[in-house]
């Protein structure tokens, strides 16, 4: 009997050892498959990151990993079940054979416990391998391939965003467009404002005008997006009626003409001084000759219909303005020491207040090109437009405040309406600033022409129609009426009619003004240039032109008409305090603008 039990127990031990060895081999296979899966996943991810494949490869890797996870989970479940069955069998076998041989049973128990520990460790390793497989695959928005750069591009740091190349229609390029639209001839009259009003009152008016410019620019940009039109006149026509469009067309046209005249006066004065100092022929010191020469150089640039072609010139304009501020700042102390009366005014109120108010209002007038820039914007969302307008206004405040304070402390109460005229002609650094400013104002003309071209075209069509009506009224009883009817029938399809794309969405970068015929643009540019050149040869006083002409256009375009647009859409603003405070502010600036024009005109007459 003992022999039988001994042989049976030995056979049982041999079978159990075989099972244990088989289980170990299975666990080794599981671990090796897990490690192979891990290595394969790592290699896949590394290859994906190196080659920058499309986003589909990432999702395929994720699916493959998920399948591997489920497969390994099933294997782990099977191994756990086998462990339980084997443990139950081993416990039963040890209980039945304890009376036969205690030493062998103790050895079996210790072996079973050690096997269980090893199996648990192996299962933990498999689970950790699966977890590692999950963390290796990167499905976040950190890195993207070239196919995804347009939509889900990772954010770069501020250095990469600031010093990277300008993209047409981007936030930075649109900010530069707003700044170059606003900073014009009025920039040189800021120290004159400080000398007449004092430092504190001038800074207060700068902040108030900056806030008004920010609010009205946002009103125009958001209204252009909502009504899907990027021409100022068409926006007012949709909101109001055709008479509103005529008013804004006149305002934009008059504003461009007045700024064009001022720029021709300034550039001719600057260049004549430079040519005189460097002993050029007397022909180049003649203002009339210089005005004609400048107009001939400006004309070809105004024929362009895309803002992107002017990006490099506009960036150079900001550079030249910065050089001018630095040059005047470095010479402030030396010129201040030459003054006899060094009394500094902090707050001053006199008859010059209204003219200075209009100069500052004109200096922040970036609204004429607001709709046009919105049409040129790439992905014109409210957040991106708000960011661009806010940055442009902040930079204008910094420029005007620094330039006004530095120019005022250089000459105090003797500052002229054009601060550059206070410097002697022998100052080489100021001559360099004059040349840089001439280039800045030169390239601002085609930019402003792009924004006001549609208005001048529409105003020309309105004038032509009025002349046709007058013609029919005078000759309606004569035989000329029949010829006129034939003439009018040829214009049923108006060749000058403005064409604009109605299918432009919020994410479109196509402007309505880009579809016009090139010949119309050339004719209007030539006619307006000749008209401005004739006036520029006669007018010399700068501040009076800004105070009257700039005051009318700035008040009309920057205050009154945005106020009308905001009043039409006032129900879209749920907060009543914000609604009525904005209306009050716009009404106040509209009233002050027109009052300043009247007072400035009366001061000149009387």
Swiss-Prot record:
The chain crosses the membrane at residues 175-194, 200-225, 246-271, 283-301, 313-332, 352-372, 393-412, 428-449, 522-539, 545-567, 579-605. GO terms for molecular function: amino acid transmembrane transporter activity; L-arginine transmembrane transporter activity; L-glutamate transmembrane transporter activity; L-histidine transmembrane transporter activity; L-lysine transmembrane transporter activity; L-serine transmembrane transporter activity; L-tyrosine transmembrane transporter activity. It comes from the Eukaryota. Residues 1-156 are annotated as: Disordered. Residues 140-149 have a biased composition (Acidic residues). GO terms for cellular component: membrane; vacuolar membrane. It is a multi-pass membrane protein. This is Putative amino acid transporter AAT1. It comes from Plasmodium falciparum (isolate 3D7).
